[in-house]
């Protein structure tokens, strides 16, 4: 699996994300942290460097497991005291059961049809699914060089992703779940949108 430098190194990944989100970086994680009570199992799908765990959940009474296809990220998570498994969500294996199933800024990897992944997350969740996804993206910039560079930097090993969600297309995806969507809100200075769904 050939990945961009950003996805090969946790520190570079974090540095890039901090640059993109600036003062709103921490808000990406606290918005999720506030929705998760103590004493539950959390499954973080496509967890990347597991920043949700290391920043928010590690010191709480939460049974956290992160899944990611990047073995280096998973090894870092385990070294930090969490549970992690190398897992390619594309293989359609049922996801491990948990109370809360989370995905942050990774749903675009499953375009053009991300609904089957959301359905598998719902099947694994006992209480809720929490999804956050960018709705403002450099990869869709009108500046061709900026867009091409952003797509290349965010290649997680499945090829540069040309497509991203807008707020309209993301809302359309979650509209199909009707009343099962119990919350939707812009977070991180309006760069991302958060959705909470019941199983």
Model-inferred region functions:
Residues 106-107:
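Hydrophobic adenine-recognition pocket in adenosine-nucleotide-binding enzymes
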Residues 182-195:
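Conserved Class I S-adenosyl-L-methionine
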Residues 102:
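A conserved beta-strand element that flanks and buttresses the S-adenosyl-L-methionine
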Residues 1-36, 39-48:
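Conserved class I S-adenosyl-L-methionine
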Residues 132-176, 183-185:
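C-terminal alpha-helical "lid/dimerization" subdomain adjacent to the S-adenosyl-L-methionine
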Residues 110-121:
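A short, conserved alpha-helix within the catalytic core of class I
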